Amino acid sequence: MRQADIVISGGGLVGLPLGLALAQGGLKTVIVDVAPKATILDPQFDGRVSALAYASVRMLAVLGVWDLLAPHAQPIHEILVTDGKAGRPASALSLHFDAKEVGSDSLGHIVENRHIRMALYEKLAGAQNLELVAPAAVKSLAITDSGALVTLTNDETITAAVTVAADSRRSPLRSQAGIGVVSWSYPQIGIVATVEHEKPHNGVAYEHFLPSGPFAILPMTGDRSSLVWTEAQAKAPALLGLEEKSFNEELARRFGSHLGRTKSVGPRWSYPLSFHLAREFVHLRLALCGDSAHGIHPIAGQGLNLGLRDAAALAEVLLDAARLGRDLGALDTLKRYERWRRFDCLAMAASTDGLNRLFSNDIAPLRQLRDLGLGLVDAIGPARRFFMRHAGGDVGKLPRLMKGQAA
């Protein structure tokens, strides 16, 4: 039987940074992941990227990961938000964010997920107090007042003070614990693709609000951008089934000509859009983190940043408890994490849901109202700067890691 302080179920983009933070703080941590290591470390480009807010970048820098990622990261210097219809000029009222206005050289970075994974695993390989068990999954979890007994699918057992579920939106551990969720589906599909274009993007990200949903163009390294295209469920299958020439024509109708000729390269991904929020984030000796706790609409590109804030807060709570000699898995210890994170997650979920409902329609009075709103925010400097700081993850009670300090 193996002994650890913490067992993390899920070695993804939230579970790995959490494990590194805990291990660097001196807690013996085991990460369990269902995917074979060869799959996790596959260097092939799969088209998926993440937007990292600058608070998340500070966290990764403290963990020693950012130096490995920086050569693969594209800074976002500006963001332009417009409203309109496919194939027509955008509204004259728009919203423009510029990093220089908040004294920064970027509002965040776009990084391919494969590079994030490989950088995290490179740090994991040389870390003390940290071990990866893969491929394996948690088969059962037995909770007592004195500890947690984790049984894996390879029949190995681990005792720990705390088990963390960072194991996807359909978290098996969350289900085992009987923690319910509030959830609903959107009548939309997310289409993800990579686009090559003639002209340089100059680090500018675009978000076009179309009647079917947001159409985001995120700058990548080189003359490439990642496309996050929200489309109505009824139309998405036909678009996904188009041959390359026809797909690029549909792309151009929405993309515009500001970057010259464009073409889709690499695989296209699609996924149904939904919302969920766990009714509880903690039980005795169990904490939910990242997608296991919440899932939001991608309209603001904040999903990973929200999960990294979970990881930073949970690491701080557990390391503080360890320094004070407290029981890491006691309910009062873990409730501090829940109180800290629940409001932020609920507020982000509500705002992304509201934005999607406001902008994903073609009702003329609403369209005029939202265009006016974009223009007003653009005209009011303090409001513009507030939204930029919010997008950068620099508001509210930040965990130490998000401030660039050790947990």
Sequence positions of predicted segments:
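N-terminal FAD cofactor-binding segment of flavoenzymes
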Residues: 44-86
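C-terminal helical "tail/cap" subdomain of flavin- and related membrane-associated enzymes
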Residues: 316-407
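Conserved N-terminal helical subregion
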Residues: 72-176, 184-189, 398
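N-terminal Rossmann-like FAD-binding beta1-loop-alpha1 element of flavoenzymes
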Residues: 4-31
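Central beta-strand plus flanking loop segment that forms part of the substrate or channel wall
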Residues: 170-205, 223-225, 231-235, 251-252
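Glycine-rich FAD pyrophosphate-binding loop
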Residues: 23-45
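FAD-binding beta-loop-beta segment adjacent to the flavin cofactor pocket
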Residues: 272-288, 346-347
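Conserved FAD/dinucleotide-binding core of flavoprotein oxidoreductases
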Residues: 100-102, 210-272
